[in-house]
Amino acid sequence: IESYVPDVPAIALGTPDLSVFEMVGAYGAFANQGIYVKPTMITRIEDKNGSLLYQSVPETKDVISAESAYVTVNLLEGVTKFGSGARLRHNIPEEDRNPVYRDVVTGYPYSFDNAIAGKTGTTQNQSDGWFMGMVPNLVTGVWVGAEDRATHFETIAYGQGATMALPIWGIFMKKCYENEELGISKEDFIAPEDLSIPIDCEALIPAEENSSEAKDLEGLGL
């Protein structure tokens, strides 16, 4: 991240102005087992005869442990399973879709069933919509907004990242998977062999407490 990051408590809410270029690089460190690889626009230049004029050499740096990177990816997988990115997976019958799904969420349903880690983002007054999506060998970022933040959607239903930016990612990835020559992974993210941080939260609940919670849910008809 090379842009100015203000030293304020609200930084956790996403107050800095960052580019898609920077965001993709940052998220790439999670997908690359903690290794940052600086994004580049040009990987190779050849002349008209095919002779190599320029070959990009990746700039890399270890920034976090492979363990921390994997746990973060595991958390972000939850976004597409249970959170604001879950519309990448589910398929609401057409007759049951609300106006947002019928008229706004372009390309729905996407019906992905592979491992996807992601994060939606929405700024103040729905001026910016974000979606950052990761599969094991590809990180893609989508930003929707305007140079002037006075230009924005009036409601969160239309202006949130899950409605503005996520559909672009979904359509793009469907096209990527249609072209098998690209080799975009549908495999699971690889966990480090020495993973010591528990990621199965249910396993940490005492058996008696877990059982009582199940009974409570049954009592609610769930």
Kindly label every feature range from the protein language model.
Residues 1-25:
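Mid-domain, small-residue-enriched loop/turn segments at the edges of structured enzyme/sensor domains
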Residues 17-220:
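A penicillin-recognizing enzyme superfamily signal
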